[in-house]
Amino acid sequence: MLSNDIDGNYKYYYADKDGHLQFGWVTHNNETYYISPPWGAENRTYLKNINEKTYLFGPKGRLLRNTATDISWDDFCVSDENGVVKTGVIRLEDNRLYYFNPEIYMTTPLSGEWAEFDGKLYHFEMPISVSPYSKGSPITTNTTLEKDGKTYIIDENGVATEKKD
């Protein structure tokens, strides 16, 4: 049974059939929850670091798997099938590529900006809305662009490679 507001601070707890509070990972009605000891779970979308992995949780501590969502104003992230927050270059449902930095949030460079991540060069387009509250700059794909007098071929993964004559 998932109970709310036991301590008056809008936190959520899980009690087993005997009424004992459960903490840590809890499965209830085929959903996975994480109840932080001793504070309980929050009634909002949030991130939590557990054993050196960052997980995405929804209201009441429900683990959000394969989810792309806002976690606050202008903070947008994506989780994998285990609820772990993804970083690096990720293709969203709009079929565009975006870069999520190691601090989790979507990177939004200025339109036309170049950036190097993990030894690879990328070019970013004008920021667009990816959700009601967040904007992201898609990574340019499948084109050729000029930078500092050099020609770069950008592949389907957004990686720019200098064109050799």
Ranges and model annotations:
Residues M1-D165:
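Extracellular adhesion/carbohydrate-binding repeat motifs centered on closely spaced tryptophans
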